[in-house]
Amino acid sequence: MMALDASRPEQIGTLPDSNTAIVVLEGLSMYLTGSQVRGLLQALDKKYQELHILMDVYTEFGVKASKYKNPVNEVGVSKLYGIDDIESITDGLRVRYVKEHSFTPARLVKELTPADRLFFKLLFTGKLYRKIYRLYELIGIVGGNK
């Protein structure tokens, strides 16, 4: 594992060479502007022939709501960024949106106790949850659609 500064996409060049990369960008995008996220995706896109990305994002509304209760407030972060439209970030890149995933798939929610099931359904599924937070799958393949 290597520590890199995501706001400096040129550091992607120091990652090991390979044809394929699987990248998990968790808890990262809210610290980067849209153009910085795009720069990071573009650098990954240039480095690898085949790229699979799982990326979580706060929406712009989610960022505003998180000002009141968010662990990042305790570490001195003063500016957060949200993404409402991932395709506006990937437009023109080989990296493209595949689908949106849920952290709480219905099949797993069904395994919870009735009280927990109700709690999860209210807070972590549906329109309210999607208004705050999203989990995206992205892919980039040489010869794929641009």
What are these regions (language model features)?
Residues M1-K146:
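Alpha-helical subdomain
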